[in-house]
Amino acid sequence: MNVKRCFFLIILVVLFSNSIYAQEYGKQYEKCSERLKNVNDDSIYILRLLEKDSCLIGVTAPNFKASTINGHTIELHKLKGQVVFLNFWGTGCGPCVEEIPGFNKLVSHYAGKKVKFIAIGSDKVPDLKKFLKTIPFNFLQIAESEKIYEEVFKLSEGIPYAIIIDKFGKIYKMCLGSAGDLSFSFYENLIDNCLSGKQ
């Protein structure tokens, strides 16, 4: 088999795999969203939203490819073998900013271990870089990423929003809202359980 044909087949396999993962997530998302239909009461609707998210646990996470603000490329499915912590946030979100000290502590705590921390923000690159000069946030930073939030993961509940993905690429936990000062201990427990394979 010549090199060009081999390369072409590899590309086809990658594209096919990405499509399968997206379809699996999309199909389960539609199934989980059924419980939101015909719910008028706001408090019950929020409860159903949270139930919808928990319904997605165990599904293969959809792939995305994006660049960090420092120009490094991240492709989610290439991170298999590691626990991946995704944090959807924004610099203008007070509860998001409150979690940063705890999140920085998590990065230090898991240094050298198979855990990857990625912050996915809605801010433009210059605005995010300016913010980070004042308040360091030690996750890998992806900016202007509404597409990942809305189209890839199909989220709509708001931020902060965290997703923990296990070493097999499956969604382990989805968490809406801020843990504030407790962000380190709250997520340390979840990450430790994920690393050890506990449900």
PLM segments and residue spans:
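Short pre-active-site segment immediately N-terminal to redox-active cysteine/selenocysteine motifs
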Residues: 82-84, 88-92, 124, 158
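N-terminal targeting signals for export/organelle localization
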Residues: 2-63
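Acidic helix N-cap motif at the loop->helix transition within catalytic regions
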Residues: 127-129
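Short, internal strand/loop/helix patches
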Residues: 118, 132-168
